[in-house]
């Protein structure tokens, strides 16, 4: 970043970040554009994700709610802490 500014996530190990946010609300966006919001329960080295209290959003509209949701890692575009 310019002028010596650093971003909050710069230099942070992604696996460390993910282990820190387990149990917290996250947003998971898939390559298809579908978004899941829920409580992160686990994530593995392949980015396979388990969520609880999950809501599914398609084009910004809530479509479904799930107790548990499992997302295969190769479908994940990003995970962000809420």
UniProtKB/Swiss-Prot annotation:
Recorded family membership: Belongs to the snRNP Sm proteins family. SmF/LSm6 subfamily.
Q: Where in the cell is it found?
A: Cytoplasm; Nucleus
Query: In Gene Ontology terms, what is one molecular function of this protein?
Result: RNA binding
Q: Which UniProt keywords apply?
A: Cytoplasm, mRNA processing, mRNA splicing, Nucleus, Ribonucleoprotein, RNA-binding, rRNA processing, Spliceosome, tRNA processing
Taxonomy, top ranks, is: Eukaryota, Fungi, Dikarya, Ascomycota, Pezizomycotina
| GO BP term (any one) | tRNA processing
State any GO CC term.
sno(s)RNA-containing ribonucleoprotein complex
Its primary localisation, in coarse terms, equals cytoplasm
The record's InterPro entries line, in alphabetical order, gives: Lsm6/sSmF, LSM_dom_sf, Sm, Sm_dom_euk/arc
Pfam families (UniProt xref): LSM
Protein name, entry field: U6 snRNA-associated Sm-like protein LSm6
Q: What is said about its interaction partners and assembly? A: Component of the heptameric LSM1-LSM7 complex, which consists of snr-1/lsm1, snr-2/lsm2, snr-3/lsm3, snr-4/lsm4, snr-5/lsm5, snr-6/lsm6 and snr-7/lsm7. Component of the heptameric LSM2-LSM8 complex, which consists of snr-2/lsm2, snr-3/lsm3, snr-4/lsm4, snr-5/lsm5, snr-6/lsm6, snr-7/lsm7 and snr-8/lsm8. The LSm subunits form a seven-membered ring structure with a doughnut shape.
Q: What sequence ranges are listed for the domain Sm?
A: 13-82
Give the protein's function: Component of LSm protein complexes, which are involved in RNA processing and may function in a chaperone-like manner, facilitating the efficient association of RNA processing factors with their substrates. Component of the cytoplasmic LSM1-LSM7 complex, which is thought to be involved in mRNA degradation by activating the decapping step in the 5'-to-3' mRNA decay pathway. Component of the nuclear LSM2-LSM8 complex, which is involved in splicing of nuclear mRNAs.
């Amino acid at each position: 970043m310019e002028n010596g500014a650093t971003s909050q996530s710069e230099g942070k190990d992604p696996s460390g970040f993910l282990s820190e946010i387990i149990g917290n609300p996250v947003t998971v966006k898939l390559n298809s554009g579908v978004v899941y919001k829920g409580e992160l329960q686990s994530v593995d080295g392949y980015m396979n994700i388990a969520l609880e209290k999950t809501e599914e959003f398609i084009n910004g509209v809530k479509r479904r709610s799930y107790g548990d949701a499992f997302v295969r890692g190769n479908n994940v575009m990003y995970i962000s802490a809420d």
